[in-house]
Amino acid sequence: MPELVPGIQQRIKALETFGLTITPNTLKIEEVTEENWATAWKKYYHPLQVTRFLTVVPSWEAYELKQADERVIRLDPGLAFGTGTHPTTILSLQALETYIRGNETILDVGTGSGVLSIASKALGAKHVHAYDLDDVAVKAAMDNIRLNDYAKDVTVKANDLLKGVTIEADIVVANILSEIIVPLIPEAYAVLKPGGLFLTSGIIEDKKELILSEQKKQGFTIIQVQQMKDWCSIVAKKPLAEDE
């Protein structure tokens, strides 16, 4: 590592060519064990009530219910995924809590840690199918599902969005980047039952109008737009046959 110091110092000095003023500084290098990186974040992660009924609890902490109708989601996000507390995740969880009535078939696209699939089962969905293009995410989701016995029948598969999926769904939920939501819109429309809902989050504020426009062009009716900090979620409905 010490042999890298001169090169780093030169690059810092070069920042002055971009008009930046570099004040006197000291470059310090020390070794940190991988185990410390792998576990240090855990001390910042504690049980958190994220919606009216849902509380996310780290897998390594004991937790007692605070209310009789509370649903607990046990989660071990590891280093690759969030803890369920990012605004985009909370917006997705709020939408699921609002629109799940019970016995639905739900498709979770870009499942990541699996938190939305687990929440769907906690809220009463009958069939939940989770998809992610990343094999690491598929494994993480499966591991987290095993932490929540009520969600043990959630299926998790590696898949590119909804390509090749023919399951008819009551709800499609996707907390993914806006650029990925756009090609998902026609795929979601195709698998949704008439009257089905498309719940999207992960939408930065300046991309909101783009997503709304694309959904409307596809034939969706917009029924709710929510915002938390710089992030938005959209709930869109596939019209019933008589509404088309």
Kindly label every feature range from the protein language model.
Residues 1-66:
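N-terminal auxiliary segments of SAM/dcSAM-dependent transferases
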Residues 73-74, 107:
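Conserved beta-strand elements of the Class I
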Residues 63-69, 164-167:
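Short loop/helix-cap segments at secondary-structure boundaries that form the rim of catalytic
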Residues 49, 55, 74-76, 177, ...:
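Conserved beta-strand segments that form the floor/walls of ligand-binding pockets within enzyme
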Residues 52-54, 104, 196:
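Surface-exposed loop/turn positions
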Residues 79-161, 165-168:
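Conserved SAM/SAH cofactor-binding pocket of Class I
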Residues 9, 90-93, 97, 182-186:
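Amphipathic, non-transmembrane alpha-helical secondary structure
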Residues 127, 133-243:
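S-adenosylmethionine
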